[in-house]
Amino acid sequence: MAIGVEPLDAPVGAVVSGVDGRRSLSDRDFHRIEQVLLEHLVVVIPDLEDDVAWLLKFGHRFGPLVPHILTRFHHPKTPEMSIISANMDSGESRRTVKPAGAFWHSDLSYCRDPSDAIFLYATHVPSDGGDTLIANMQRVYEALPESLRKVIDGLTATHRYGWGGKGAITAPDPQRRAQYPDVVHPVVRVHARTGRRSLFVNPGYTMCINGVPGDESEAILEELFAHSQREEFCYRHRWAVGQLVAIDNRATLHRAMADYREPMRKLRMIVGCAERDTPGAGNLLN
């Protein structure tokens, strides 16, 4: 079956049909999916089997994979895949007040080499919620007032793991804190593949804008965060079992919705292909 592409009527996203999870993707089909991801920032592939090996192979086609910072999330077969679950009937999930990921963030923005893409596969879906919100940060940047764009172009921001999870993130112990020191990234990121600019700050991990007074930094970030969460920039993805969703992490933010009453929501997550040529990124702070 030929690959089909249907863009979503949303700020991001396209559904890709014709993918057979029982077979390896041809180079032609993979490059088609890759181009759709670059163009639409989110790719939804429905009706795939729960095949860990296939999912890992798909992720590896995009580049190296990065294990989750917390080993307790690692899949029992491989650290390259994580199990992100929220069973609110269990003590495990109650380590955090909210389900994991229930805050706006960009995966690994707290690392020297942020993630290029994440891949989420649904195995358990509540019937009454548990959606994922995704914001198009290219459109967010382009819609900023010109005066504000002039202020932030060329500035950098400091990112820290655990900074702003608001009850949906496990605070790192001293060993993890030493392993992941604060990092600096440009406030406006240039996409290495497309050259498009996007806003690269997020409430989950961005501490401050550098080179400006603290109160001014806080005011700018509050304005940028509020702007990025406006409805016209966001897509709300409703999960179905067997869906694989690829997200271009370089130009989006995302968050899980903690709005469901049923106990279980479970996704398999692959985080991958950390580039080492992000313009302006990577100065470690000690």
Model-inferred region functions:
Residues 1-244, 250-286:
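Non-heme Fe(II) oxygenase catalytic core, chiefly the N-lobe of the double-stranded beta-helix
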